[in-house]
């Protein structure tokens, strides 16, 4: 279960203002629950935890078992934005940090990602890896025409067909796409690919608990049922029309701080396994709130590492910051610090302490220092990193994002600004139909 602690904000806001913002958050929650707000045709994510059928997970497990029987030891997941960040976040959080370097036979394939950039070096080096491995691919796109994943898929599809033959390739490629339309759906039907559906009413950044995230997480060997259970408990908790609703608490405080001049929110973690939670969170809030000249700018850091780079700015820089700290109460591993008779490093006072105890005290000390430096602290805690708690975090942040966007007065479920770079890129690449725009752009260069 996710717990919210706003004590680190008490010296920056007063109770009356907070209560007023709670009322605003509850009003926004009502709009979300009654589906009467902007973007209400993209609310299919709200009940995914409680309504996802077990047969969907079983289908994903069948893909896993089929590929295991073929000896597949490398799966390339192709997608961008919400089509890869949720799965990447889950796999990074749940996997052994050095799983790909440990000796011994792996029980699950290595999962790598493509289609989230246009780097020629990246895709070429990925191909180098594929040539040494037994490969399969998951391509994720509603349309099949998004440039980055479409380019990567064209190259990877050609490689798999050339290596294994067209018929076998059709059993090594799975598509997650629209149910009825789009280039990828048409190609999948033509080639005979197994497909999973992205529903029309779920946007990419809210799709981690659909086949977009579920399939790669199952392929990675993790317990999606536990993840959905954690998310389902948060679905219930975050629907409550009361101040005890954790999503309401978080949305209310971050909007109050925003209106008080804190325009940048930094998501802080103290475990490198959660680095990609920050990347997923940045897309979720950046695309949902950054529009109409409004929005909190989302950033992320990994402490204690980034205390030795960004720590100086956070402590002493411009006072436009707030921090949301992800606290993990218990470690999944245990290691104590040994005594050293020479004590040249002066650390014998730590003898017998767990490394995680040092991490916890670094977290507490940093919170207090940053409060003293004028940076409010919102704390989000979970008991440990596992599937259940990760599912709870996913749903908590999604629900709070919808509430927060409505409080801000924007549509949290569209992303019109994303099209601007695409139009320029298409024009500069010579896509038919963009000739006039290309001419205008080239005059500026």
Predicted regions and their residues:
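Extended, charge-enriched "interface" segments that sit outside catalytic cores
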Residues: 1-69, 341-345, 349, 437-445
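Glycine-rich phosphate/diphosphate-binding loops that line cofactor/substrate pockets in enzymes
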Residues: 59-73, 126-135, 253-263, 314-319
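C-terminal helical/tail subdomains of lipid-metabolizing enzymes
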Residues: 378, 384-445
């Amino acid at each position: 279960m996710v717990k919210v602690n706003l004590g680190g904000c008490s010296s920056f806001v007063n109770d009356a203002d907070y209560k007023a913002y709670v009322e605003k958050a509850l009003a926004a929650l009502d709009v979300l629950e009654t589906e009467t707000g902007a973007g209400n045709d993209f609310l299919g994510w709200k009940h995914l935890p409680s309504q996802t059928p077990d047969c969907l997970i079983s289908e994903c497990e069948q893909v896993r078992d089929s590929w295991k029987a073929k000896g597949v030891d490398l799966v390339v997941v192709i997608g961008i934005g919400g089509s890869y960040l949720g799965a990447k976040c889950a796999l990074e959080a749940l996997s052994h940090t050095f799983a790909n370097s440990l000796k011994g036979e792996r029980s699950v394939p290595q999962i790598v990602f493509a289609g989230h950039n246009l780097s020629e070096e990246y895709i070429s080096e990925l191909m180098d890896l594929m040539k040494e491995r037994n490969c399969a691919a998951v391509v994720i796109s509603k349309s099949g025409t998004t440039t980055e994943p479409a380019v990567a898929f064209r190259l990877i599809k050609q490689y798999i067909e050339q290596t294994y033959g067209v018929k076998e390739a059709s059993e090594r490629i799975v598509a997650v796409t629209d149910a009825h339309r789009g280039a990828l759906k048409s190609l999948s039907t033509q080639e005979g690919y197994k497909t999973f559906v992205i529903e029309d009413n779920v946007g990419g950044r809210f799709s981690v608990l659909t086949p977009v995230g579920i399939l790669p997480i199952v392929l990675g060997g993790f317990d999606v049922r536990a993840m959905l259970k954690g998310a389902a408990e948060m679905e219930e908790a975050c629907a409550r029309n009361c101040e005890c609703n954790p999503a309401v608490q978080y949305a209310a405080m971050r909007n109050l701080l925003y209106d008080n001049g804190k325009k940048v929110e930094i998501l802080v973690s103290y475990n490198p396994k959660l680095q990609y939670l920050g990347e997923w969170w940045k897309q979720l809030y950046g695309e949902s709130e950054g529009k109409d000249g409004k929005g909190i700018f989302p950033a992320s850091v990994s402490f204690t590492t980034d205390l030795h780079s960004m720590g100086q700015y956070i402590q002493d820089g411009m006072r436009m910051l707030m921090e949301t700290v992800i606290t993990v109460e218990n470690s999944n591993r245990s290691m104590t610090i040994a005594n050293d008779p020479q004590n040249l490093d002066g650390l014998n006072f730590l003898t017998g302490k767990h490394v995680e105890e040092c991490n916890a005290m670094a977290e507490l000390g940093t919170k207090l220092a940053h409060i003293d430096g004028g940076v409010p602290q919102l704390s989000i805690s979970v008991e440990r990193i596992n599937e259940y708690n990760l599912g709870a975090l996913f749903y908590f942040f999604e629900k709070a994002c919808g509430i927060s966007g409505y409080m801000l007065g924007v549509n949290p479920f569209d992303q019109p600004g994303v099209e601007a770079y695409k139009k320029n890129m298409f024009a500069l690449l010579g896509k038919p139909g963009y000739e006039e725009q290309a001419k205008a752009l080239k005059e500026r260069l």
